[in-house]
Structures are given as structure tokens and as C-alpha cells.
Amino acid sequence: MLDSKLRFFLQRCVVLEQAKQVHAQLVVNRYNHLEPILVHQTLHFTKEFSRNIVTYVKRILKGFNGHDSFSWGCLVRFLSQHRKFKETVDVYIDMHNSGIPPSSHAVTSVLRACGKMENMVDGKPIHAQALKNGLCGCVYVQTGLVGLYSRLGYIELAKKAFDDIAEKNTVSWNSLLHGYLESGELDEARRVFDKIPEKDAVSWNLIISSYAKKGDMGNACSLFSAMPLKSPASWNILIGGYVNCREMKLARTYFDAMPQKNGVSWITMISGYTKLGDVQSAEELFRLMSKKDKLVYDAMIACYTQNGKPKDALKLFAQMLERNSYIQPDEITLSSVVSANSQLGNTSFGTWVESYITEHGIKIDDLLSTSLIDLYMKGGDFAKAFKMFSNLNKKDTVSYSAMIMGCGINGMATEANSLFTAMIEKKIPPNVVTFTGLLSAYSHSGLVQEGYKCFNSMKDHNLEPSADHYGIMVDMLGRAGRLEEAYELIKSMPMQPNAGVWGALLLASGLHNNVEFGEIACSHCVKLETDPTGYLSHLAMIYSSVGRWDDARTVRDSIKEKKLCKTLGCSWVEGSYH
């Protein structure tokens, strides 16, 4: 009678405290044979991961007199389901070391964990244990082997495990399909896909996504059209493919046709417009959204920040805080907002962010730290920037580049060079931004030879100098009075020189009152810019500086005749070269 009552209560244990109360009755009345049911019920009804429950179950398992594979398997599966992959493997090893034979659930779960860990674990020993315990006839174990070997890149072993499955299900087929796709064998993956007897959404999405990532939107679109039931994820994959190919018109066509848009759909489109610099279209979509969540605000703020509209980014951030008390910015939001303030040179905002983080318990990650470093360096608060940089958990290309760029803007060549040397010693690969900062530092410090060495070393790091890098070199040579050398460098450029490059030569011509190169540079700027007022004004000043008053007057008259609005500033004066 008591046995039946305890079984009744065991079936209804849904929280830890209830489980403990029933467990106490089991121990007192020596009904230990019911403990496996307790373990199962406790883990089964726990929807969210709980460290207390795991500790409690482990204590029960350690106290078992008999070898209960079922209960150990429940714990292994629970940990795997909650993405505690390392602990899943550790518990499985404990079970094995205790001499307890694994259940099919335990093997399936640990195989999944092995493939999901950051440093994937070779599953061959587990495969051997499954064979020894006669579990390789289980379709779930066999499918788990296919999945693990696929992720490890052992595609032949995955294929063999797949062939051994007597009754293949859709999950088995998808595991093999995923394996070929992960190995980059798209043609073989397509053959597998075509053989799948009952394709599900995962099958379709895997193959469509692979074609989209490759940029083969013809095949991706054809498969999408053939897909019988399209999920929101399927639509997003196709839209994302067109976005990555910069085909925003086609992306917008499918977006507009999508029956049920979700947050990912809107964010994908806004991000696509962001990359193309089409802020107006991004704004239009943003306004169309009836209910905006934090991620959508993040996308739009990032759009403004990345496209040189920092004031709009800050205005939207303020609106987000005012209108949506339920939305709290996190490190991603704040990183974009800090970058916007960095463009405005407002270092005081960094102090506000640090206070906000402390007040709201937000974790300051390396992304946000790097944005703050960039803000402080550009604002001249070097002590704060260097302190924050030294406290980073992991220094990477982006954080080093932010520091070096800050040094470059402020002419700190020694510091920039030291950072670059440390970066190379730690085998952290530099990028084009790194060299922009380093070259700027050498340019501001007049270190021409070092600048040349740096410029020529870009190819050693598999980087091709861009027009911006050539522009900085022209600026550096121009500052040093080596105008002819700067002109020859421009003529040697593998790409078409832009107005920024010619503008650097024009400015240098003004510094040294050189009419010849000033005229050459200005003529190119006039051809390249729709409003060349600033360039013409500067040429007029060069004429005036050498006493050629008539020529200066002629240039100024031409500005008036063309009804150009005279503005003394122009892009190359406000850009990164100065």
C-alpha cells in the first residue's frame, strides 16, 4: 500500500522541494528501488537548467547500491539538452569508471555533446563501448555516430555508420547531409538531399542555406520555390542570401512577399541596407515595424553609426530609453552608441556608460571595452584607454587596431609601433585598419622611412593597400616636402586615385607653395567631386601665396560663375589623413 502511495507522489514531483520530501520517505521506508523513478521525474519536469538539481541527482546516483543505467542516462541526457556539453562527457566518464553499462539514451546524448564541445572529442571510444554493449542496432545511437563523425570531418566513417542503419529516418539523412555540407562537398550533399524519401524543413533549409552561402542564388531560389511548406526560417535564409550578395531589390521582393515576418527578417533587411549605405531604406523599414524590440533598435542604431550619422544614432538611443521602459540596452547596444560618440569626440559619454553598466549590472565584454578604448583614444584620454586595454580578457585584432588607430590620430608613433610589435609577437594578424593607424602615426611624426617599410610590409600579411593607405602615404611624403615622390606614388596606384588621395597632394602643395602639383591635384579633384569648391578655394590660396593674384582672382570668379557654394572645408581636410 505504501509502495503504491509513494509511486503516486513520485509521478507528481515537479519541484525540487517536493522531490526531496518524497525521497526522504523512500529512504526512511527503504524503498530505494523507487529512486530511479525519482531521478527521472525530477529531471523530466525541470524545464530550466538548475545547478541545485544536478548536484542533488548526482548525490542520489553516488548513493545507489546497484548499477542503474537508466538514472545515469537521464542525467547525461539532461545535461546534453541544456548544452552543458563538457559536464555531459564528464558524467558519462564517471558512469563508465563506476562500471555501469551505458543506456542508448546516454550514448546518444554523449555523442551529441562530443560534437558540440568547443574542442570536439573523438567519439571512437564511445563507439567501441556502444558496440560492446550491443547498442549499435539502435537507430538513435547510429544517427548520433553519423552526426559526430560528420562534425569531426570523418565523412567516410559517417557514411559507413549511415549505411549500417537498417531503418533510416529523416534525422539520419539530415545528419549525413549536414556532414557533406560541413566538408564542403556540396555536389555530394545535393545527391544525398535528392535521395531523402521524406524531407523535412531541416533538410530543405540545410541545402538552401548552403547554396545561399556559396552565392549560388539560382539553385537556392529554385529549391525554395520547390519547398512545399516554407517556414519563416526558410524565408529568412533566402532573404539573407540575397542580402549577402548585395541584391537588395530581390531581397526586398521576397521580404515583402513573406507571409509572417519575424524579428530576424526585419533585422536582416536593415543590416543589408546598412552595408550598402542605404540609410533611407533602412529607416523606412524601421518605421514600418509596429512593435520594435531591442534587437531591431540595435540594428538601426548600428546603421546610423556605421554610416556616419552619429547624431541620429544617439537620438534613436534616447528614444529607445524614453519610449520603451521594458527595453534595457546591453553591451551590444552600448557598443554602437559609444562608437557614435567616438565619431563626435564626446569622451564624457564613456563615463556615463561605465556608470550605467555598474548601476544596471551589465557585463562589460571585450566588444564594449574595445568601443570605449576607441572613444578614449580618439578623445585624448590615453590613460583610461590603456588601462581598459590592459584589462581586456582577450586582446584581438580589433582591440589592437583601435589602440593603434588612436595612436595614429594623435601622432603617437612610438606607442603605435610598440603595440604593433606586441601584436605580431603574439601572432595576432593585423588588418587594413591596423595599418591605417600605424601609417597615420608615422605620417604625423614625419617618419617617412618607417612609413615606407610599414606600407611595403602589408603584402607580408596578405593585405593589399587600399586607396586610403595610398592617401596617407601621399600625405606623409607631402608633409616632408617630397611632392614629386608623392605624385609618382599616385601614378603607380593599381586602382583609380580618389579625391582623398589627390586632395592630400593638393594640401601638401599648399604647405610648400608648389603651384605645379597644386594645379595637377586640383584638376583631378574637380573631375571627381560634384562640389569642388573647397579644392578650388585652396588652389586660389596657393596662387595668392606666390603672388599670382590674377590667377587667384580667376579661380574665385569661376566659383562665383558656376554658382558654387563656397565652403572652406572639404572631405580630405576632414578625413583620416589629417
UniProtKB/Swiss-Prot annotation:
This protein's UniProt keywords: Repeat
GO molecular function: RNA binding
PROSITE patterns referenced in this protein's UniProt entry, alphabetically: PPR
Type E motif, as annotated region: 501-576
Segments annotated as PPR repeats: 68-102, 103-137, 138-168, 169-203, 204-230, 231-261, 262-292, 293-327, 330-364, 365-395, 396-430, 431-465, 466-496
UniProt GO BP: RNA modification
Entry keyword Thylakoid: no
Origin superkingdom: Eukaryota
Disulphide-bridged cysteine pairs: none
Claim: Transmembrane helix is one of the keywords in the record: no
Family named by the database record: Belongs to the PPR family. PCMP-E subfamily.
NCBIfam families linked to this entry: PPR
Protein known as: Pentatricopeptide repeat-containing protein At4g22760
Protein's organism: Arabidopsis thaliana
Gene behind the chain: PCMP-E6
